[in-house]
Amino acid sequence: MTQNKKTILYIDLCGRLPYNTIISVAERVTDGEILWNDTTLTPYLFYRFAEDDMWDYVKPYLRPMDSMSPEEMQEHKDLYYQAPIYRSNGNAYRDVRKLETLHIDWLNSRHFDHRGLIEAGLALKATDEMYKEDCYD
């Protein structure tokens, strides 16, 4: 795996760490410990990936953007109205920086592949059963 791809994957996984993203780790023995397929990304495993060259074996299971349900599309669209409004000289402005963060956090929390990792071969397509809608906040 190239350094650029490792960087993209690392950045993506950092944002998904709080959301119990399911990852595939190719069966491999490291320091006498067997790592099996389909585990949840945790700080411990994340640390192990950082210290060992395991990036070639790690792939998160993500949902393609086109798998978003109509209800999810509406919820994602409604995030616009959650961004703070600032007023200046009689004009109203939304904080675009906060809006971008809201969108990325929402997409990460629902395990959507908003960076195109599936097409790049850095992630696997999640099955419908992997991430149930009732587990979202």
What is each PLM-predicted segment?
Residues 1-137:
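Structural boundary micro-motifs
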